[in-house]
Amino acid sequence: MTDEPQPPEEAREERLARKEVLFRSVNEAIEQQALEFGGLDEYEFICECARSGCFERISLTLRQYEHVRAEGTRFFVVPGHQDVAVELVVETESGFVIVEKDGHAGVVADLADPRGGN
């Protein structure tokens, strides 16, 4: 966020948050297509975890998707993909877990929220 060197843990948190933010932006595009074409009860979104190489799919309704997007620090992940070092599990649903970034990762996620942050 600044040009000063970050403590190693803060740099790790930022790197993980930025990966999840990237997948959030992909899922925003999926939602826009779903809204444009409609017709399905559930849509396939990409797991928003920070695991390298994870492209697992999660089925959500648009209502569930909007529920997660209501908070700029929240993401949905496949159960077991949460990283307790940088996020808290706030809800467990059938087929996915909603996590919330905290600390520096939460700041990064909220600032990068395409819906304006909170």
Predicted regions and their residues:
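Polybasic/polar functional segments that serve as interface/processing modules
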Residues: 2-118
